[in-house]
Design a protein with these regions (language model features):
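One-carbon transfer enzymes
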Residues: 1-5, 65, 143, 153
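Conserved core of the sugar-phosphate nucleotidyltransferase
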Residues: 33-111
Length: 157
């Protein structure tokens, strides 16, 4: 599998989870994800087939290509990117899905934008799906580089 969504979709196709209608995917680089992040993703599935969460992006992260920026209109994601935008919210690596979109994910085209940005959620957007997004309080650390691991350990000593 190339990304977390493909892994979750693969698990769904194995039919081991037939009794469930909703799923959550927490990216491995987000060790500080809180229950609130997961709960909001799942709660917003009443309005959308695919959901995610975000928080205010610290200014120091705006130009960091490892930090994913979310551009949105209200509670709907318009774009995700790694570029130096100087604006955008901090996209946190938590996704909620209803079952049907996961069954379809493997037939959606991998786009140039997804390959360049290395962001799986762009496949949804470029295929015409809407992604719902909700704000959460988050002051954790995202692990993107070895120095992030050191910073995370310092927070928990």
């Amino acid at each position: 599998y190339e990304n977390g969504t493909e892994r979750v979709a693969g698990a769904i196709r194995s039919r081991k989870f037939d009794e469930y209608d909703q799923f959550v995917n927490v990216q491995g680089d987000m060790p500080d994800v809180t229950p609130e992040c997961i709960d909001k993703c799942m709660w917003h599935l009443k309005n959308y087939q695919v959901t995610t969460v975000f928080t205010e992006m610290p200014e120091t992260m705006q130009n960091d290509p490892n930090s994913v920026k979310l551009v949105r209109a209200g509670d709907q994601a318009l774009w995700f990117g790694r570029g130096m935008t100087g604006y955008g919210d901090w996209h946190l690596g938590v996704y909620g899905y209803k079952k049907n979109p996961l069954h379809l994910y493997h037939i959606l085209n991998v786009t140039k934008e997804e390959r360049v940005e290395k962001l799986e959620q762009l496949r949804w957007l470029k295929s015409g799906w809407q992604i719902g997004c909700l704000s959460v309080y988050f002051k954790g650390i995202e692990i993107n580089a070895p120095e992030d691991v050191d910073a995370w350990h310092k927070n928990y000593q």
